[in-house]
Amino acid sequence: MIRNARRTDIPRLKEIRDSVRENRLRDPSRVTAEDYCWFVDNPGIFVWEEKGGIVGFSAADPRNGNIWALFVDEAHEGRGIAQALFERACTVLLSAGCPRLWLTTSPGTRAERFYRRAGWRVTGSRAGELVFER
């Protein structure tokens, strides 16, 4: 089930994000609690919850059309959770009137393959990451 994230969810969101091996931002000092709080306070961060536990989340920034995060606990991959969270994030951005939806991810990762399969296209690079747009 998808629901809006709450501040009390932040420790679990950080845990999920930090557990993804292919994540360049695994260093906890690079993504702060304040970053998460902004998304909780400004609708755009959603969690997938099962049996009382969070297994994935997405975050979208309506200020600039950016998908800031999409992470699923590895034990729950391959079940459509990422796709559902991704669609929710895109809906938030489109509803906010964002003319450009974009994100960055490292090349050669599962995330890159996911975004390509979703029909997003690479439009450049930024700080060693691919820039995808829809």
Predicted regions and their residues:
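Active-site acidic-Proline motif in GNAT/NAT acetyltransferases
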Residues: D73-R79, P107
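Conserved GNAT acetyl-CoA-binding A-motif
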Residues: L93-S106
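Short beta-strand-to-coil "C-cap" segments at the C-terminal boundary of structured domains/repeats
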Residues: F132-R134
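A generic structural signal for beta-strand entry/edge sites
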Residues: N64, R100, A127-E129
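Conserved active-site alpha-helix within GNAT-family acetyltransferase domains
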Residues: Q83, P107-G124, G128-L130
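Acetyl-CoA-dependent GNAT
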Residues: N4-A75, F86-E87, V92
